[in-house]
Every structure is written in structure tokens, then in C-alpha cells.
């Protein structure tokens, strides 16, 4: 599907959903509001558009684009960030957003104990366990996954837990031989974070604001491509 057709399709799908649910507000959580999202708002004068615009953007020239995108919104919400003091990106000096507390699915009261979390995930209670959340896709991201997994080879009796199979787009494994790997599906993962002795995670908003409050010793690996 071409980009133009996709934008039209997204607009029409959103408008149909708004009509079906009688929604009054459309919320976009992302870096760049898609043309289809903007088109949906422009096609329905009664629809309010809210942009959940996270901070810590890369320090790249925005010219007029950021201001134009922001002006199209009825409201902008910026989720707080534990690293906000180090935000020197183009949104850091803007005064057009409502700042909230950091948003996280981790709640101490809801988090399982180490024992219960390991039972829920089917893990050995006594072996060391590491969570790896790095994603896959482009070659540079795949290389980081392979490097991270290779670095764990010397850890005796280690259980390595992933939320996605470590394979490239062609189905080739990114993991070295000699690791005990397990892919888990559990939501919300924040409730079972006490199962892990350590983590290797992409520096995404959700990962940072779940693993840090859960006090899981974690190596955060940044991806500076594109809008990441």
C-alpha cells in the first residue's frame, strides 16, 4: 500500500471508529502525528485531538514543523520523565504542553514477589535470570541484540528471558549457541519484573519507567536512528 493510500485508509478507519463509538476525543501517542490522524480531525469539526508528546527528543533542527504540528492540537500532554533534567531537545523549552507525573504500569502494590513472578512465568526459582528487551528489525538493532546475548554467555546457569523471538526478518536466529532462552508472553510485564535479577533493555519510555521503579539492575541501550 502506498503512503498516500495508507493515509486515506487510516483517516477513514479513525472516522468510522469515532462514529461507531461517538468518541469526542482522539489521542495520538507518538513523535510525529500521522497525516491520516490530522486528516481525521480536519474531517470532523467536533473531534478534539490530543497529542501525548513525550520529551527527550534528539537535538535536531525542527524549523517550523514542530510548531505547526503543535498548533494543530487541541491539547498536548507531556508525560513526566525521570531524565527530564537532561532534556535539551526542541520540546524542552516549549510551554504548550501539560506536564504530568511519569507514567508507568509498575505499581509496587500490584507487583508479584520474586517467587510468585517466577511461578507465573514458569522459571526456575534458584537460577539467575536476565530479561532482554531490545527489539529486532534493522541490521544495527539486530547487531545490538546479538552483542547483548553474546555478552551473557559466561553467566553460569543463566536463564535468558525475552518477550520476542531473537530472529531477523528472514527468520535467522540472532542468538549464539549455549544460552538457555525462553520467550514469554505476559501482560502487564510490569507485574512480574521482580522475577529478574538484571535486565538489558532499549532506552524506551516504558522500559525505563518500569524497570527503574521495580529496582531491576538494568543496562539501557539507546537507539538513535530516526525519531527514536
Give each language-model segment a name.
Residues 1-90:
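Active-site and donor-binding regions of nucleotide-sugar-utilizing enzymes
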Residues 23, 72-74, 94, 179, ...:
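Short, well-ordered alpha-helix to beta-strand connector turns
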Residues 28, 186-228:
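A donor-sugar binding/catalytic signature common to diverse glycosyltransferases
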Residues 31, 81, 135, 204, ...:
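Short glycine-/small-residue-rich Rossmann-like dinucleotide-binding loops
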Residues 54, 59-60, 69-136:
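A nucleotide-sugar donor-handling region in carbohydrate enzymes
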Residues 59-61, 83-88, 140-141, 167-174, ...:
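Short, charged/polar "capping" segments at the starts of alpha-helices
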Residues 68-70, 86-94, 168-179, 211:
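Short loop/helix-cap segments at secondary-structure boundaries that form the rim of catalytic
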Residues 112-198:
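Donor-nucleotide binding loops and adjacent catalytic segments primarily
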Amino acid at each position: 500500500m502506498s503512503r498516500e493510500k495508507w493515509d486515506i485508509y487510516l483517516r477513514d478507519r479513525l472516522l468510522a471508529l469515532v462514529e461507531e463509538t461517538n468518541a469526542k476525543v482522539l489521542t495520538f501517542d507518538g513523535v510525529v502525528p500521522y497525516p491520516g490522524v490530522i486528516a481525521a480531525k480536519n474531517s470532523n469539526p467536533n473531534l478534539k485531538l490530543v497529542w501525548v508528546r513525550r520529551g527527550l527528543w534528539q537535538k535536531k533542527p525542527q524549523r517550523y514543523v514542530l510548531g505547526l504540528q503543535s498548533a494543530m492540537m487541541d491539547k498536548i500532554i507531556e508525560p513526566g520523565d525521570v531524565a527530564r533534567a537532561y532534556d535539551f531537545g526542541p520540546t524542552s523549552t516549549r510551554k504548550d504542553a501539560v506536564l504530568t507525573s511519569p507514567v508507568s504500569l509498575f505499581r509496587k502494590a500490584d507487583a508479584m514477589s520474586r517467587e510468585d513472578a517466577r511461578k507465573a512465568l514458569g522459571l526456575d526459582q534458584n537460577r539467575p535470570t536476565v530479561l532482554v528487551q531490545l527489539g529486532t528489525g534493522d541490521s544495527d538493532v539486530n547487531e545490538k541484540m546479538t552483542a547483548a546475548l553474546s555478552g551473557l554467555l559466561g553467566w553460569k546457569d543463566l536463564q535468558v528471558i525475552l518477550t520476542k523471538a531473537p530472529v531477523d526478518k528472514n527468520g535467522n536466529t540472532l542468538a549464539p549457541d549455549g544460552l538457555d532462552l525462553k520467550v514469554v508472553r505476559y501482560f502487564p510485564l510490569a507485574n512480574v519484573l521482580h522475577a529478574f535479577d538484571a535486565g538489558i533493555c532499549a532506552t524506551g519510555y516504558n522500559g525505563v519507567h518500569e524497570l527503574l521503579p521495580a529496582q531491576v539492575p538494568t543496562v539501557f541501550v539507546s537507539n538513535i536512528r530516526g525519531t527514536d
